């Protein structure tokens, strides 16, 4: 693991490209407006009512796909499978492809784990009451660092994970980005279907996770891994799986 971090450090230092803009201002501006509009228009009706039973059942079926545990395990598996392939395969092309897979695993791991950690810290620091307690506290009740999950609604941790994961795939495979965005919205909104979060919690989580994926992609591009930087600073996925 020490060699892994040393390799990243060398790549970072060798890069002659300056750090591109992180676009956090634009992301924050759009997210704040979407969150405020959601709070004004949707959060109160959602908190005051219950989703119909079929909708809640659908949400319960789908919401588990946004759990970070299986995504983290999958990313670790990709990383070590790729590393093993790099050592065992013979041709230069096969080795390059195996290494590419391992870096995809590393990218997904960093994106999902660190965005999730930050989101969980934020939700504890903000301490917004969940929709289950709307009739007791309303939608603008906050108890920072209460240590109780009832006051850990904003932003949604599941939605952060979903936003990070599907944004990562949208950056890696931009041809399918519309499908990935649709999946992220659907899985994020399952948290509203099951009554665990307000829509504004989900919007904030999806946006934060997606921006964190962009940030991580920029850092990887700066190190020459998986991505390259376009003239405007946007990370573009490298392609190693072309046919011969």
UniProtKB/Swiss-Prot annotation:
Record's bilayer topology term: Multi-pass membrane protein
Enzyme class (EC, first level): hydrolase
GO BP: lipid A biosynthetic process; lipopolysaccharide biosynthetic process
Classification via CDD domains: PAP2_lipid_A_1_phosphatase (cd03389)
Locations listed in the record: Cell inner membrane
Coiled-coil regions listed in the entry: none
KW Lipid metabolism (keyword) present: yes
Alphabetized UniProt keyword annotations: Cell inner membrane, Cell membrane, Hydrolase, Lipid A biosynthesis, Lipid biosynthesis, Lipid metabolism, Lipopolysaccharide biosynthesis, Membrane, Transmembrane, Transmembrane helix
Record GO cellular component, one term: plasma membrane
EC number of this enzyme: 3.1.-.-
Sequence intervals crossing the membrane: 28-48, 60-80, 98-118, 154-174, 178-198, 201-221
Gene Ontology molecular function, alphabetical: hydrolase activity
Pfam families: PAP2
Pathway(s) the chain acts in: Bacterial outer membrane biogenesis; LPS lipid A biosynthesis
Keyword check for Lipid metabolism: yes
Other information: In this strain lipid A lacks phosphate groups, and both tetra- and pentaacylated species exist.
UniProt family annotation: Belongs to the lipid A LpxE 1-phosphatase family.
Function: Removes the 1-phosphate group from (tetraacyl) lipid A species, has no requirement for the Kdo(2) moiety of lipid A. Has no 4'-phosphatase activity. Reduces sensitivity of S.meliloti strain 1021 to the cationic antimicrobial peptide (CAMP) polymyxin B.
Protein name: Lipid A 1-phosphatase
The species this protein was found in: Rhizobium johnstonii (strain DSM 114642 / LMG 32736 / 3841) (Rhizobium leguminosarum bv. viciae)
Lineage: Bacteria, Pseudomonadati, Pseudomonadota, Alphaproteobacteria, Hyphomicrobiales
Encoding gene per record: lpxE
